[in-house]
Regions:
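Predominantly extracellular beta-rich ligand-binding scaffolds that present long acidic/polar faces
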Residues: 1-278
């Protein structure tokens, strides 16, 4: 089916079912949801909880959440501001609300298996492990997205864009504070078999354990990171906490290099569409 919101907003929803999965304005979407905003609402469940949709297998476009997404203490996972678990396409969506849970927690999507494009988060995102400003656990593609919200995990796999990455992150950036225990990075906490290209972070990175980096916490042997930068004035440690994979042009830049436009130039280099600007 098709839900066309016509730029209207939905306000005052309250749903708290601690043993329920697929919770949101729509619990499950197999059609098309577009042009709707969720305000002053609260969604709490066991797994797959999102402000707009709990579980998406199709398309969500031009939607946003300004409500609270919450997971119970013994929750299974997949909590996102827009969508809890995404097996479809999220485009031009954003979250400004609080998102909290245990595992797989993200500002836009908790668990992304397909596509997130042109989305952003400014809300506070917190969880235990697999926590990210855009997505908690990525095995799909994340493109042209940015996080400005505070991201925190009490344990591991925490990143400004994605906590854990197994596929592709391109043209994304983070300006929010990122905090966790181990495997913590300004862009991504744990890059397993994924590719991260043309990404940038200027937010603080704080890790109390091991494998902490300005860009990536840990890059495994099958991981690839290319043309990614971080503000070395804000975070004075290494770009990658532990690098076992393939890297090229992954380094810190000073605030002066950001101000002159050098970093924007490097990120835009060789791209036909204008993505990065000063």
């Amino acid at each position: 089916g098709i839900f066309e919101g016509q730029n209207h907003t939905i306000s005052g929803l309250y749903f708290k079912q601690e043993n329920t999965s697929e919770v949101g304005f729509f619990g499950y979407n197999g059609g098309k949801i577009s042009n709707v905003g969720i305000l002053n609402s609260y969604f709490c469940g066991f797994s797959r909880v999102g402000g707009v949709c709990g579980y998406n297998s199709s398309t969500i476009t031009n939607c946003y959440n300004k409500g609270v997404v919450d997971g119970t203490a013994d929750a299974a996972g997949s909590f996102g501001g827009v969508c809890g678990c995404n097996l479809g396409i999220l485009t031009n969506c954003y979250n400004t609300g609080i998102v909290k849970g245990q595992l797989f927690v993200g500002g836009v999507s908790g668990d992304n298996i397909k596509t997130i494009t042109n989305c952003y988060n400014t809300g506070i995102v917190s969880g235990q492990s697999y926590v990210g400003g855009i997505d908690g656990d990525n095995s799909g593609t994340i493109t042209n997205c940015n996080n400005e919200g505070k991201v925190s995990g009490t344990e591991d796999y925490v990143g400004g864009v994605s906590g854990d990455n197994n596929k592709t992150i391109t043209n994304c950036y983070n300006t929010g504070i990122v905090s966790g225990q181990s495997y913590v990075g300004g862009v991504n906490g744990y890059n397993q078999n994924g590719t991260i290209i043309n990404c940038n972070t200027t937010g603080e990175v704080n890790g109390t354990g091991s494998h902490v980096g300005g860009v990536i916490g840990m890059n495994l042997s099958k991981g690839t990171i290319t043309n990614c930068y971080y503000d070395s004035t804000v975070y004075t440690g290494a770009a990658i906490g532990d690098d076992m994979g393939t890297t090229e042009k992954v380094e810190g830049k000073t605030i002066e290099q950001y101000k002159t436009g050098e970093v924007a130039y490097l990120l835009q280099l060789d791209q036909s569409d204008e993505v990065w600007g000063q």
